[in-house]
Amino acid sequence: GAHYIDLADGRRFVCDFPAAMQAAFAAAGRTAVAGASTVPALSSAVIDHLCAGWQRIDSIDICIAPAQRAPRGQATLAAVLSYCGLPIDVWDGGRWQPHSGWARPSPVQFQRLSPRLGAVCDIPDLEIFPAHYRARDRVTFRAALEVGLAQRAFATLATLRRWGVLPHPEKLAWLMHHAGGALDFLGTPLGGMVVRVAGADAQGQPRRRAWHIAADNDHGPEIPCMAAILLARQLAAGQPLPTGAHTSTSLLPLEAFAPEFAKWGMVTDVVEE
């Protein structure tokens, strides 16, 4: 049998993968990793780094901010439109609450990018991290498009779906994919990501920290591939990974990503807030 690594970011696929595949891969003595991508592989590596030694984590807020001019695919657009306006279970206020996908965008601040509006998206982290990190208050994930008009268009589609006017916004993926290029002149090749955490450090003192990455020259789409590349290199070098089926959560340290960031000229910052 062979080892298995994927870059999936579908919440149900990634979260259900370990239980569904554990027996088969454990019996074969092989490793299977789902979601070896920006989320939850890189996002968990960042949280592990920011919160090392902390007594507790209260909140985790993640936002990905793609560059308007970066390459984008119609299939990806269809996938995100599929839950636009649908309720997403989010750990918020210490309990599970429904948040509407892509609705009600709110401001997000970045270290090296201009402020953007970000809206809730459905990813594995929302389900994995509350238990994995025992987050007391909330775990959120937002996507922040560079052009505000595009972000508000998604919010409008979410509203239309909630009203029952547009039950299948994913059918507009082809149109929006081609129309999106008309907005490229309003954007830049600069994208990024921020992970914010709050909690109590090793001394029990309140702490708020943030990790930022900025990817210029339309290199942002290289980030989702990095975790899979790093894990594949480990296997090729004979370095053991846990047998059985797993998500990529906390399988890689943040330091492992540093050479990949440098290769593409990406800049990271850790900020005490």
Residue positions per predicted region:
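C-terminal active-site/capping subdomain that shapes the small-molecule cofactor and substrate pocket
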Residues: 159-273
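Short, ordered loop/turn segments at secondary-structure junctions
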Residues: 2, 9-12, 37
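Buried hydrophobic packing segments
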Residues: 46-51, 129, 227-235
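Active-site-lining helix/loop region of Rossmann-like oxidoreductase modules
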Residues: 52-199, 205
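Rossmann-fold NAD(P)-binding glycine/threonine-rich loop
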Residues: 8-31
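Adenosine-phosphate binding glycine-rich loop
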Residues: 28-67
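Catalytic-loop motifs flanking and including active-site residues across diverse enzymes
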Residues: 42-46, 122-125, 223-228
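Hydrophobic beta-strand scaffold residues
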Residues: 3-4, 32, 268
